[in-house]
Amino acid sequence: MKTLLLTLVVVTIVCLDLGYTMTCYNQQSSQAKTTTTCSGGVSSCYRKTWSDIRGTIIERGCGCPSVKKGIERICCGTDKCNN
């Protein structure tokens, strides 16, 4: 009986942990705030900032992409942390 109970507890913990999905902001520059649920396995959000002839551009989303020189990138690991 104790073995069965322990097995059920372990299975529950594993299933709850695997079911977590990250939520990140995904609006661009000065648009209204919107969020997206990241695909499975993605555990970070990013915000990229750069300037061009239009002014300061901000891009947000899921993951932590590589960037070119001159682009500031911030990656973080909690829900909606990329505001």
Swiss-Prot record:
Pfam families: Toxin_cobra-type (PF21947). Residues 1-21 form the signal peptide. The keyword Disulfide bond applies. GO terms for molecular function: acetylcholine receptor inhibitor activity; ion channel regulator activity; toxin activity. Keywords: Acetylcholine receptor inhibiting toxin, Disulfide bond, Ion channel impairing toxin, Neurotoxin, Postsynaptic neurotoxin, Secreted, Signal, Toxin. InterPro entries: Snake_3FTx, Snake_toxin-like_sf, Snake_toxin_con_site, Toxin_cobra-type. Expressed by the venom gland. It is found in: Secreted. Its main location: secreted. Disulfide bonds join C24-C45, C38-C62, C64-C75, C76-C81. The keyword Translocase does not apply. Binds to muscle nicotinic acetylcholine receptor (nAChR) and inhibit acetylcholine from binding to the receptor, thereby impairing neuromuscular transmission. Belongs to the three-finger toxin family. Short-chain subfamily. Type I alpha-neurotoxin sub-subfamily. This is Short neurotoxin 3FTx-Oxy3.
